[in-house]
């Protein structure tokens, strides 16, 4: 039996498998976004690397959110959300929105157009506004499917990336 075949047949303890699973996915480079919404009249949101396009007809995206997060109870079908694709210069914003925060903790964050149904962050590489169409519970997270209502791409910029549990920027094309 080859070593690879032996590895496939060996049972791995659940905690070891969970740790290895997280380690494998930490190597998948992802763009960094902040999903935002109004909580009353205040900006609220969270950092997400799980944002992806789903469909062109209809225009649909998804993101995932932990059910234990402060944001999860604020989201529901029909709610408006904004998705801002961050630049490498916006790392501090990513860190801020990645941790639990007190109500009103983002009052000083620049919003591109506060009159919108969904807030969008100033200086981002791209903006998408969307309406939540469906929330599908899956384990300890929920998959949130959204119908896109608007999209805007900045003229240029350097994206913020997350890989191997740290931030990176895109320095050159290969």
Question: Across the structure, where does each feature detected by a protein language model lie?
Answer:
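Basic, polyanion-binding surface patches
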Residues: 2-174
């Amino acid at each position: 039996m080859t070593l690879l075949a032996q590895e496939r047949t060996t049972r791995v303890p659940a905690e070891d498998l969970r740790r290895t699973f997280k380690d494998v996915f930490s190597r998948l480079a992802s763009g960094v976004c902040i999903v935002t919404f109004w909580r009353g009249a205040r900006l609220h949101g969270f950092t997400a690397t799980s944002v992806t396009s789903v469909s062109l007809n209809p225009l649909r995206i998804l993101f995932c959110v932990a059910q234990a997060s402060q944001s999860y109870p604020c989201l529901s079908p029909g709610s408006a959300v904004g998705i801002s694709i961050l630049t490498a210069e916006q790392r501090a914003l990513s860190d801020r929105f990645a941790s639990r925060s007190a109500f009103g903790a983002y009052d000083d964050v620049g919003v591109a157009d506060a009159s919108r149904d969904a807030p969008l962050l100033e200086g981002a590489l791209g903006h998408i506004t969307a309406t939540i169409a469906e929330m599908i519970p899956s384990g300890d997270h929920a998959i949130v499917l959204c119908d896109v209502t608007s999209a805007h791409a900045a003229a240029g910029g350097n994206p913020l990336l997350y890989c191997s549990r740290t931030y990176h920027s895109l320095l050159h094309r290969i």
